[in-house]
From Swiss-Prot:
This is Phosphatidylglycerol--prolipoprotein diacylglyceryl transferase. The gene is lgt. PROSITE patterns: LGT. The chain crosses the membrane at residues 24-44, 70-90, 111-131, 219-239, 253-273. Its EC number is 2.5.1.145.
Length: 289
């Protein structure tokens, strides 16, 4: 009988990234987790509209998230190319952007390898900004509608990374370590995907969901999320293996940590700017009275 420690340490090698295949088309856990993530954000946002008397109709989350889905896919891919795979892009610009291989008079889907969270976040922000401009609704109020639910959806994205056996951690002697088949060496490594799923996902969700009704002004939750996620991810990066093609990009910091530092700075900037914006709006409303 296998003891728990042995089972735990070899768990990654027992998981299959493919759920099932239909006519040669593989349905993967990673893509499914993206769908689950969007479904969670959609359902929790609809719950908020129905129970918290927010100024949105019931069709609003679906419309906005349709734009956001395009933003996360495009932004996540472009972000990965710019932040982590620019040399690859220079060698094969078309192949990095279009997941189709051509040859011998035929073409085949080669898959999309590499998505950046930070790029996806920027893509979502741009998509929602365009959406709010088109529908003439407040951008910060729109983002704050989705922010409390976002970390819980993100949790499933990191679980998808874990099932894929990617984004594993650094070598460790701790019993919590695991053997990842895709790692360059046979050694126990931190399951950093699970650390991220728990702290950046579940813990941050509990915090934001608890305080969502107490947000003092539009943009508060958005700024707090950027600071919270950036801070937690920055420290978890010390347990995560740096990307092989980059290593450490500044001193002993990884690209993820550099981006998280910028994310924290952006969060602070949004808090300051949105508070000033709200105060100015209050002054204008007072003058109209």
């Amino acid at each position: 009988m296998i003891d728990f420690t042995t089972w735990w340490q070899h768990l990654p090698s027992q998981m299959n990234p493919v759920i099932f295949s239909i006519d040669g088309i593989a349905i993967r856990w990673y893509g499914t987790m993206y769908i689950v993530a969007f479904a969670i954000v959609y359902l929790l946002s609809k719950y908020r509209i129905s129970n918290e008397k927010l100024p949105f109709d019931k069709t609003f989350p679906g419309d906005a998230l349709t734009w956001a889905m395009g933003g996360v896919l495009i932004g996540g891919r472009i972000g990965y190319i710019l932040f982590y795979g620019f040399d690859w892009f220079l060698q094969d610009p078309v192949g990095t952007l279009i997941p189709i291989k051509f040859g011998n008079g035929s073409c085949a889907f080669s898959g999309i390898n590499g998505m950046s969270f930070h790029g996806g976040l920027i893509g979502v922000a741009i998509a929602l900004w365009l959406f709010t401009r088109t529908h003439k609704v407040d951008f910060l109020k729109t983002v704050d509608l989705f922010i409390p639910a976002l970390p819980l959806g993100y949790t499933f994205g990191r679980l998808g990374n874990f099932i894929n056996g990617e984004l594993y951690g650094r070598v460790t002697t701790s019993a919590i370590g695991m053997y990842f088949p895709a790692a360059p060496t046979v050694a126990l490594r931190h399951p950093s995907q699970l650390y991220e799923a728990f702290f950046e996902g579940i813990v941050l969700f509990i915090i934001l969901w608890t305080i969502r009704k107490k947000a003092p002004w539009p943009g508060y939750l958005s700024g707090l999320y950027l600071i919270g996620y950036g801070t937690v991810r920055f420290f978890i990066e010390f347990f995560r293996e740096p990307d092989a093609q980059l290593g450490f990009v500044f001193l002993n910091f990884s690209m993820g940590q550099v981006l998280c530092f910028l994310m924290i700075a952006a969060g602070i900037g949004i808090l300051v700017w949105s508070k000033q914006r709200a105060e100015n709006a209050d002054v204008m409303m007072g003058g109209k009275r």
